[in-house]
Design a protein with these regions (language model features):
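N-terminal Rossmann-like dinucleotide-binding module
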Residues: 1-45
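Basic phosphate/pyrophosphate-binding loop/patch that engages nucleotide-derived ligands
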Residues: 107-115
């Protein structure tokens, strides 16, 4: 079983969350969105624990992967935090709107050898 934290609960995040929930190989342990009411509501739909600080997911040793579906401006920040804690990463596109930030992020991922 692969334990996952989903960050971002907009339309695409909810869609990915429902898909993850249907797959028995995954456990959607945490959901997070900047909107606390939405986090609480969607956590019930996705049968997962709501968190109101994404660092909880990064620091949890049981979390194997971080699924990033938040706004584009948060992607690099969340990716680098996942890299720091050696989590596997899935990030919705685009990674960022700045190619230099993307290149720097890519270098850090290669250095840390995460997925």
């Amino acid at each position: 079983m692969i334990n996952i934290a989903l960050l971002g609960l907009g339309r695409i995040g909810i869609m990915h969350g429902k898909n993850l929930m249907r797959n028995k190989e995954f456990k959607l342990k945490y959901v997070y969105d900047i909107n606390k009411k939405l986090t609480n509501k969607i956590s019930k739909v996705l049968k997962s624990s709501p968190i109101h600080n994404p660092s909880i997911a990064f620091k949890d040793k049981e979390i194997d992967a971080i699924f990033i579906a938040s706004t584009t401006s948060t992607h690099i920040k969340f990716i680098l935090e996942a890299v720091k804690y050696k989590k596997a990463i899935f990030c919705e596109k685009p990674l960022d709107l700045n190619i230099n930030k993307i290149d720097n992020c890519k270098k850090k991922i290669k250095l840390e050898k995460v997925n």
